[in-house]
From Swiss-Prot:
GO cellular component: extracellular region; Gram-positive-bacterium-type cell wall; plasma membrane
Cofactor(s) the protein needs: cob(I)alamin
Domain annotation LysM: ranges: 65-110
Organism field: Desulfitobacterium hafniense (Desulfitobacterium frappieri)
UniProt name for this protein: Chlorophenol reductase
Length: 327
């Protein structure tokens, strides 16, 4: 079973990009420059009066720097390598109708050539203030969960992803978490390698795996009924994303270490009846302001940030480590 799931891990890492929101990771391939076609010079007019040069359409080939897709590339990786968001790269390449379908050999515009601004004015232009630098990073953390003690043949593989924007001080500007959870029942008959029916795998090879992330599942994920907060998975994750804005990754790590229990959950100050004796001993050391903060936090979210289900803190650290400036 472990060998089979090892294969699943390899497949799933390729498809885990479905969990990625609007930012991207770092690629190591290089780009090539394609020059725009030079317009032909207009014919000399017969008349002695000056004549306007004819208009030449060069819109079919956009001037700028192009990247040539190689096997294994993803659109978000190409965007990240060149300091772009997925949306920005898509706007540069309107000919690409589906960013999830790119092919080896395809050329993608990654930097448009800036037209020289002609000016006859002798006045001095105002100098615009320097733009604040932003950095983007993407992180993944995969973990295999042995669930045998709870349910036979129901182990699972979880791939946690995070896309983040950081300012030049390292503070989080935007943050999006998600998880792809891969269960055995997504592979009918996978426990029997000799099974005659291999149609699932054949279809997958032709059409891909139609997996949904936890956010894509939305309310169908079904956490709301059992959550002490009465909130669905995506609602709680949205809360964490907003709460961590303005903090550095180091500050998030410190917050997690101090205010979360052994299961990676914030101490449930909003639900004191849920606190264990160990929890009560710990929160007794907090100030009133800290206790109030935890009431506010656990009103919005109580699910774990780091446990066998998912590794949000690990993924966030990786995103920061590979951050690249957005240009």
């Amino acid at each position: 079973m472990k060998k089979t799931l090892g294969i699943i891990l390899s497949i799933s890492l390729a498809f885990s990009v479905l969990a990625l929101p609007i930012f991207a990771a770092v690629d190591t391939t290089t780009s090539a420059t394609v020059e725009a076609a030079t317009p032909a010079a207009p014919a000399t007019p017969a008349a002695t009066a000056p004549a306007a040069a004819p208009s030449v359409d060069t819109s079919k080939i956009a001037a700028g720097t192009y990247y040539t897709v190689v096997s294994g590339d993803f659109f978000w990786q190409i965007a990240a390598k060149h300091g772009l968001t997925i949306d920005a790269l898509a706007k540069l390449n309107p000919q690409i109708k589906n960013v999830n379908l790119i092919f080896p050999g395809q050329k993608i515009l990654v930097k448009a050539e800036e037209a020289a601004a002609a000016s006859t004015s002798t006045s001095t232009a105002a100098v615009a203030p320097a733009a604040k630098k932003l950095y983007q990073g993407i992180g993944m953390a995969a973990n295999y969960r042995d669930n045998t003690a709870r349910q036979k043949d129901h182990d699972n593989l979880n791939i946690t992803t995070v896309a983040a924007l950081f300012d030049d001080a390292g503070k989080i500007v935007k943050l999006q978490f998600d998880v792809v959870e891969i269960l055995p029942d997504m592979f009918p008959g996978w426990m029997d390698p000799e099974a005659a029916d291999k149609s699932f795998y054949k279809d997958a090879q032709a059409n891909g795996f139609n997996w949904e992330t936890k956010k894509e599942e939305g309310d169908a994920y079904g956490m709301k009924a059992s959550a002490v907060s009465g909130k669905e998975w995506w609602e709680q994750m949205n809360f964490y994303e907003e709460y961590f804005k303005g903090k550095t990754v180091a500050e998030v790590q410190d917050w997690f270490a101090k205010y979360c229990d052994a299961n990676g959950r914030p101490y449930k100050m909003a639900y004191p009846e849920k606190l264990t004796d160990a929890d009560k001993a710990k929160v007794a050391t907090f100030t009133e302001a800290e206790k109030k903060m935890l009431v506010d936090v656990t009103t919005g979210a109580t699910m774990s940030l780091q446990d066998p289900h998912s590794r949000f803190i690990d993924a966030l650290v990786k995103a920061y480590e590979v951050r690249k400036e957005v240009k």
